Amino acid sequence: MGLIKKSKNVTTAERDLVKRLTKKCIKEIVKVKWEILGPSSKRLTMADVWDKLYLKIKCKGQRSYGGKNYVCIDISDFRKGRTFFTEYARIKSDPIIGEMEFETSEDALLALIAHEVAHMIHYNYFIYTPWLRGGDNTPHGQSWQKIYRILRRELVNTNKARLAA
């Protein structure tokens, strides 16, 4: 298991929830059908990702982020009970990966975690995965969006409360 760190103001229950949702995202994206590869064209497994992961959970009203074997989640909106998940301008209008109202704050938290796990997977594995190599590999580019789209479609958007058009 990788390293999990929580800020002093984060409860054990909140830490465990973020850990569970992070694992859920990783388990989905390493499924055989998505063909995410690691070094030497080896199919990625849960252990490959989880054992290297540094997961940090904080509650400071700051940004969350994901990168090289690293995911940092700020749970402030979750703790406030917010169910609306905002996205960056580049993707906010996308019907699958855009901004969305969810039924519960836990669902909105899952959307946040999926966003950051997508960054971590993209950063570490796009170079090894043929279907990710060809696109725009910027942080919110086409390749990252492909990963994020899988996570949102398969895990997150199943509990959305669609916004009125």
Kindly give the residue locations of the regions a language model identified.
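Active-site-proximal or metal-binding-adjacent scaffold patches in catalytic folds
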Residues: 1-111, 120-165
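Walker B catalytic acidic pair
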Residues: 116
